[in-house]
């Protein structure tokens, strides 16, 4: 948002930005007050976003935040009017919306050290940081040894903590899988994301996919989420061993099969760069010899 504009003109600019973007995509504004005033002018509540109204096409769910002078003065160069209340507001909004920015030359405060910066980024749910500005502060964090950790934990960072599964399954019968994923990052995804369980034949690479009714945007920071899957194997699925993968692709059809847009789990040794799959380090045996439960539901793997 351009500085020096009155509230009515800011509203007009923001109207056009939201109109130009696809539904569900988000813009960012310089201060919490910009968003709150825009909502007030539109007759909307100015309280922080909650799970009840997040991820909708409502205007409150489509306006995130950008701090131009992070930890650079008592008010971050005018980012905050009421520092305590505004930070509380941003911490709540950052659970559902993009929050990030850049540093500035400190004015009236000491440069933020690593511990303070990391604590503040986690509290405010930061998803990105400008690496080019301000070098004086960024280089300080590099010298103090925390920049690599900041990069790892910025935004979401999903770690598979445990899992269990049916090891032997008959075609047409029930496969059970339970996964637990912890988000060790500062924030959560703010754009939609698909989730798929993938079975791939060890011998000939034939692949079967099961879309899951799971929303990774709800895997919030410092929380562990459980995914429980009960699905059927196709009745004509060939006998053999199959490795299990978790795929978190972009849901847009033009990007869904592009591994560059798939989410990579933080666990070592699980990422498959050529497909964008995350190996669960699990293998099932599809066999005609096992007496397992017949599956009569609607969730069935399909051949890719």
Predicted stretch roles:
Residues 148-304:
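Extracellular/luminal regions of secreted and cell-surface proteins that mediate adhesion/ECM remodeling
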Residues 20, 29-34, 41-44, 48:
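Non-catalytic protein-protein interaction scaffold segments in large eukaryotic complex-forming proteins
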Residues 53-164:
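Substrate-binding cleft of secreted/luminal carbohydrate-active enzymes
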Residues 33-36, 135-136:
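Solvent-exposed loop/turn segments at secondary-structure junctions
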Residues 1-5, 9-12:
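Single conserved hydrophobic/aromatic residue that forms the stacking wall/gate
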Residues 13-27, 123-124:
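A structural motif corresponding to the C-terminal end of an alpha-helix
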Residues 25-31, 130:
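A structural signal for short, well-ordered beta-strand segments and their strand-loop junctions
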Residues 35-39, 188-189:
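Short catalytic/ligand-binding loop motif for oxyanion handling, primarily in non-cytosolic enzymes
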């Amino acid at each position: 948002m351009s500085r020096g504009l009155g509230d009515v003109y800011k509203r007009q600019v923001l109207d056009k930005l939201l109109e130009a973007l696809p539904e569900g995509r988000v813009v960012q504004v310089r201060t919490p007050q910009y968003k709150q005033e825009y909502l007030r002018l539109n007759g909307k509540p100015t309280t922080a976003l909650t799970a009840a109204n997040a991820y909708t096409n409502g205007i409150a769910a489509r306006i995130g935040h950008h701090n131009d002078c992070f930890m650079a003065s008592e008010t971050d160069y005018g980012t905050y009017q009421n520092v305590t209340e505004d930070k509380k507001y941003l911490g709540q909004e950052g659970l559902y919306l993009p929050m990030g920015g850049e540093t500035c030359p400190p004015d009236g405060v000491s440069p933020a050290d690593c511990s303070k910066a990391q604590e503040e980024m986690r509290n405010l749910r930061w998803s990105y940081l400008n690496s080019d500005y301000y070098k004086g502060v960024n280089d300080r964090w590099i010298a103090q040894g925390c920049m690599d950790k900041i990069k790892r934990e910025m935004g979401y960072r999903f770690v598979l903590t445990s899992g269990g599964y049916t090891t032997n399954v008959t075609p047409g019968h029930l496969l059970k899988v339970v996964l637990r994923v912890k988000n060790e990052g500062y924030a959560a995804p703010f754009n939609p994301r698909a989730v798929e369980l993938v079975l791939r034949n060890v011998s000939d690479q034939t692949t079967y996919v099961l879309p899951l009714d799971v929303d990774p945007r709800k895997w919030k920071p410092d929380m562990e989420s459980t995914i429980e899957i009960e699905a059927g194997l196709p009745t004509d699925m060939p006998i053999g061993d199959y490795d299990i993968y978790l795929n978190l692709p972009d849901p847009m059809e033009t990007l869904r099969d592009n591994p560059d847009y798939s989410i990579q789990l933080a666990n070592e040794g699980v990422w498959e760069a050529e497909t964008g799959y995350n190996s669960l380090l699990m293998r099932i045996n599809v066999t005609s010899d096992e007496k397992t439960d017949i599956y009569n539901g609607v969730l069935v793997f399909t051949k890719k």
